Design a protein with these regions (language model features):
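Conserved beta-strand/loop scaffold segments within soluble protein domains that form the structured core
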Residues: 1-175
Length: 175
């Protein structure tokens, strides 16, 4: 089975000063191909658990967009289970929100799995964007590629003007 168009799932925040919890599971049957876009937006506090089960020889592409309102707090765990000779392409883009924490894990269930985790973030002054990843290579002949890139935009007049460059007095400044 091949899904020709991306499946777009929009997750709206619960609203200012409101908390909500979610759980989403996306399963691909063996030999299936699909792309899923998770579009996060709105305000409030939202915590969720997202599971990706990629069957044997299946191919799943995920794009997770975190473009929350300035007051939003989002704590999310993305867990991927990758089958024999299966392919996972996970792309995370974090742009908005007050605090965004994404914890991603990949577990290979059989030999030959292939996972690529790509991330991009752009943080303004005062934003906390955190991505923590773990790829468990517990099966033979599996491969992974993890690349995260980001840009920080801050106000040098803040109480931590050297935060983006290290601490010069400790010899940690970057030139």
């Amino acid at each position: 089975v091949e899904v020709a168009e991306p499946i777009v799932i929009t997750i709206d925040g619960p609203g200012a000063d409101t908390v909500a919890y979610g759980h989403l599971q996306i399963r691909l049957a063996p030999f299936a191909r699909a792309a899923v876009v998770l579009d996060h937006r709105g305000s409030g506090t939202y915590a969720d658990n997202v599971e990706f089960v990629v069957g044997d020889s299946a191919h799943l592409t995920v794009v997770a967009i975190h473009d929350w309102a300035d007051d939003a707090v989002h704590v999310t765990a993305h867990h991927a289970s990758v089958g024999r000779d299966a392919v996972l392409r996970h792309n995370a883009v974090s742009l908005g929100g007050d605090l965004i924490r994404l914890t991603g894990t990949v577990r290979y269930n059989a030999p030959g799995g292939d996972a690529e985790l790509l991330g991009l973030y752009f943080a303004d002054d005062g934003q906390h964007l955190e991505h923590r990843l773990l790829v468990d290579h517990s099966q033979p002949n599996c491969k992974s590629n993890v690349v995260y890139k980001g840009a920080l935009q801050g106000d040098p007049a803040t109480d931590r003007p050297d935060a983006q460059f290290g601490l010069p007095e400790a010899g940690l400044g970057l030139m």
